[in-house]
Regions:
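Divalent metal-dependent phosphoesterase catalytic cores across multiple superfamilies
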Residues: 1-179
């Protein structure tokens, strides 16, 4: 475990960055090498939830942030705040990464869990990019549940969170019957 940290700056070179620390919790679930949830540390690695809040940002301003993970700072990621008095959210329903498991691919093969997650994550990325291009003044993203098809498959959550666009927006999710 390590203390979660984020730093925020006005320039990509991170000069003058302000650092914020947060909290980290360990969940009672562990992730196996196959990306599924298991019940003990002997069967897999611990799952950590890190939370950091950055304060003092101004509206209509472009910032860059980095997160600290495994002893290193990430690449600088850009985000732009919008008008604080007027909000625009995009609402998505059922991204459900992994839902095409068991369906046939374009090559005629039955899709396994990993292939289905990859396929659905690709389509989710296209959907997200298209929606954001059509709505450039979006403040945050919302989903109405079912981010994944199976809550025990970490790789499905990774597919949901993978699009680059997810790094620059606040996200609010609702738990669906598959989550």
């Amino acid at each position: 475990q390590e203390t979660p940290k984020v730093r925020v700056a006005l320039s990509k070179d991170m000069k003058g960055a302000v650092e914020f620390t947060g909290t980290q919790d360990t969940t009672p679930k562990y992730i196996s090498e196959q990306g599924t949830t298991v019940s003990s540390a002997e069967e897999g690695e611990a799952y950590y939830a890190s939370k950091v809040s950055a304060e003092g940002v101004e509206e209509n301003t472009t910032y860059y942030y980095q997160y600290f993970q495994n002893g290193e700072w990430s690449e600088a990621i850009e985000f732009t705040t919008q008008d604080f008095d007027s909000y625009k959210a995009l609402l998505f329903g059922d991204p459900q990464i992994g839902a095409c498991k068991g369906q046939q691919s374009s090559e005629g093969d039955t899709m396994s869990g990993y292939l289905a997650a990859r396929n659905d994550a690709f389509n989710w990325n296209i959907t997200l990019e298209t929606a954001l291009a059509a709505n450039p003044d979006t403040n945050f993203l919302m989903t109405a549940g079912d981010q994944v098809n199976s809550s025990s498959n970490e790789y499905e959550y990774a597919g949901f969170l993978n699009p680059d666009a997810m790094q620059g927006y606040a996200l609010s999710t609702t738990i669906g019957n598959h989550d």
